[in-house]
Amino acid sequence: MTMLDTVQHHSQPQSGVPQNHLADEFVETLRLAVPMMLTQLGQIAMITTDLALIGRLGEDAVAAAALAHTVYFVSFTFGLGLMAAVSPLVAQAFGAGDVRRIRRALRVGLWVALLISLPMMASPLYGEHILIALGQVPQSAALAQRYLNGLAWGIAPALGFIALRGMMSAVNRPQPPLWITVAAIPVNAALVYVLIHGLFGLPELGLFGAGLATTLVNLGTFLAVLAIAAWRKPFSDYRPLAHLWRIDWPLVRQLIALGAPISSSLLLEYGLFSSAALLMGLISTTALAAHQIALQVTAVLFMVPLGIGMAATVRVGHAFGRNDPAAVRRAGLVAAVLGVALVSALTVAIILGRYELGRLFFGGSEASAATVELTATLLLVGATFFIADGLQTIMGGALRGINDTRMTLAFAAIGYWCVAFPVAWVLAFHTGLGAVGVWIGFSIGTFVYAGLLVLRFRMLARRLVG
C-alpha cells in the first residue's frame, strides 16, 4: 500500500453506510466529537483539581490563583487560536490525499507553537506588575506571581499538545489525546499535592509548586502524544517528524493568517466575559457569586458544542480538501442540527435542575437562599444564550474548515461589543434588571453573532456549489 493509499484508506468512514447519506454524516461527526468533548472535560477536571488542592492553602491562595489564571489565559488564548488553525490545514490536506502537506502543516504548527511561546511567557512572568497596574492589592499580586512563575514554562508544551491533537483529529483519530488526558488527571493531582506540601523529601513549594506541577504535566502529555505521532500507525505513515528543522515560511504565513482572527475572536469573547464580572461586581456581591456559578455550569455545557465545532472543522475541511461542495454544506448542516439538538436537551435538564445546581454550590442555608434564587434565574434566562453560544461555536468551526476566519472576527466584534455589552449595560443599570439584564444582553448579542455565522456559512456553501 502506497502512502497515498494509506491516507485514502484512513479517510474512509468507519461505518458501512454510504458516505453521501446524512445518517453517515451524523455518525462520523459524533465519532469525532465525543473524544474531543471528553478531552476538553479532562482539561477542566485538571484545572478544577488544581484549584481544589490550592484551596487547602487558604482563601488568599485561591484568590491569587484566580488572578494568576486571568493573566495566564489572556496570553494563552492568543496561542490557542493560532494552534486551532492546524486542524483545518491538516483536514484539507487529508481530504485531498496530500501526505506531504499533512506533515508540513503539523511541522509549521509545532514551530509556531515554539516561536510564539517565548513572547507569550512575558505576560505571566511579569504578572505581578500587570496586576498591580490594574489596581490589585500588592500582596495578592505577589502571591499570584509565585503561581505564574511555575505556570509560565508550560506554555510551549501545551501549545505543542494542541497542535498534535489537531493533527490527530484531522486524520480521523482523536482518541490518543483523550487517553493521555485521562491518564494525566490523577498524575496532575498527585504532583500538585506533592509539590505544594513538599512530600518525599521535596521542598514545600506552595503556589509555585502548583504551577510547576502543571508545567511538568503539560510537558509529559506533549511528549506522550509526540511519541504516539512518531511511532504509532496511522500517524507514523505520515512521517510527522521528518525534516522537522525545515520551516515552511509560506505555510507559516497561511497558518497565522488563518489563526490570528481566531485568536482575536477568542480574546473578544474572553474580554466580554471578564467585563461581565466587572458589571456584576458593580451590581452586588450576590450578583457576582451567582454569575460565577452560572458561568461554571455554562463552561461544562460548552464542551458539547465545542467538541462538535472541532468535528465540524474536520468534516468540512475534508470535504473542502477533496473539492466536494455538497459535502461541505452537508457537514456544516449536520453539525449545526446535531449541536443545537444536544444543547437544547441539556438546556432543558439545566432549567429543570437549576435550583439543585445552585444549592450544590451554595448549600441550603437561609443566608445563601438569595444567591441560589438568582443563580436559578440566570440559568433560566441563559437558555437562549446556551443554544446561541453553542450554534456560534459550531458554525465558527465549520467556517474554519473552509479557511474563513476574518469575517468571523468581524461578526464577533459586532455581536459581542456592538450588541451584547451595550444592551447588557442598558438593561442592567437603566431598566432595573440588574444581573438578569446582563445575561439578557449577552444572550441577544450571542444570538446575533450566531445568526451572522449561519448566514455566512450558507452564503459560502452556495457559492462553492455554484
Swiss-Prot record:
InterPro entries documented for this protein: MATE_fam, MATE_MdtK, MdtK-like
Gene: norM
NCBIfam families with a match to the protein in the record: matE (TIGR00797)
Lineage, top ranks: Bacteria, Pseudomonadati, Pseudomonadota, Alphaproteobacteria, Hyphomicrobiales
Stated family: Belongs to the multi antimicrobial extrusion (MATE) (TC 2.A.66.1) family.
Transmembrane intervals: 68-90, 110-132, 142-164, 177-199, 209-231, 251-273, 288-310, 331-353, 368-387, 407-429, 433-455
Name of the protein in its database record: Probable multidrug resistance protein NorM
PANTHER family assigned: FMN_FAD EXPORTER YEEO-RELATED, MULTIDRUG RESISTANCE PROTEIN NORM-RELATED
UniProtKB keywords: Antiport, Cell inner membrane, Cell membrane, Ion transport, Membrane, Transmembrane, Transmembrane helix, Transport
Record organism: Bradyrhizobium diazoefficiens (strain JCM 10833 / BCRC 13528 / IAM 13628 / NBRC 14792 / USDA 110)
